[in-house]
From Swiss-Prot:
Belongs to the conotoxin O1 superfamily. GO terms for cellular component: extracellular region; host cell presynaptic membrane. It is found in: Secreted. GO terms for molecular function: calcium channel regulator activity; ion channel inhibitor activity; toxin activity. It comes from the Eukaryota. This is Omega-conotoxin-like Ac6.4. Omega-conotoxins act at presynaptic membranes, they bind and block voltage-gated calcium channels (Cav). The presence of a 'disulfide through disulfide knot' structurally defines this protein as a knottin. The modification Cysteine amide is found at residue 70. Keywords: Amidation, Calcium channel impairing toxin, Disulfide bond, Ion channel impairing toxin, Knottin, Neurotoxin, Presynaptic neurotoxin, Secreted, Signal, Toxin, Voltage-gated calcium channel impairing toxin. Expressed by the venom duct. Disulfide bonds join 46-61, 53-65, 60-70.
């Protein structure tokens, strides 16, 4: 019985901590574009800086294609 009460209290405490930290971290991601570009380069096969590219086929890791070159 005591063990059950301790487990219930521990679960309630952990849940409260999760809810508090979730509220504090809302909207604090500052560099979303940088993070998404990093994920893009890690999850897909993309071309590095200076490689040839076309505007119709978005495949540059840097995210920009200028004058036929990834920039």
């Amino acid at each position: 019985m005591k063990l059950t009460c301790v487990v219930i209290v521990a679960v309630l405490l952990l849940t409260a901590c999760q809810l508090l930290t979730a509220d504090d971290s809302r909207g604090t991601q500052k560099h979303r574009a940088l993070r998404s570009d990093t994920k893009l380069s890690m999850s897909t096969r993309c071309k590095g800086k200076g490689a040839s590219c076309s505007r119709t086929m978005y495949n540059c890791c840097t995210g920009s294609c200028n004058r036929g070159k990834c920039g």
